[in-house]
Curated annotation (Swiss-Prot):
Cofactor requirement: [2Fe-2S] cluster
Classification via PROSITE patterns: 2FE2S_FER_1, 2FE2S_FER_2
Keywords on record: 2Fe-2S, Chloroplast, Electron transport, Iron, Iron-sulfur, Metal-binding, Plastid, Transport
Annotated residues for binding of [2Fe-2S] cluster: C39, C44, C47, C77
Compartments, record wording: Plastid, Chloroplast
Organism in which the protein naturally occurs: Brugmansia arborea (Angel's trumpet tree)
Record text on cofactor binding: Binds 1 [2Fe-2S] cluster.
GO biological process: electron transport chain; ferredoxin metabolic process
Pfam families: Fer2
UniProt keyword Iron present: yes
Protein name, entry field: Ferredoxin
Amino acid sequence: ATYKVKLVTPDGPVEFDCPDDVYILDQAEEEGHELPYSCRAGSCSSCAGKVTAGTVDQSDGNFLDDDQMADGFVLTCVAYPQSDVTIETHKEEELTG
């Protein structure tokens, strides 16, 4: 399946289609959008965003705890879309602050 991903970035929103077996960060880059990242392995908070609508599968990540995920935080480098999804990007400071 392919879902619509909307990223709300500091430069404004961007939308693109993302297959459910491609990480959102990878697909965003494929579409020409630059997002923050560091490890690309779900082990840090550089790429953190916040899901405001829809659902993702980020079971490949290990940095976020259950409370953070319940609050909507997502690591875009290990997140697969599970529905049409809206994510606010550049949330590392909010997460770690």
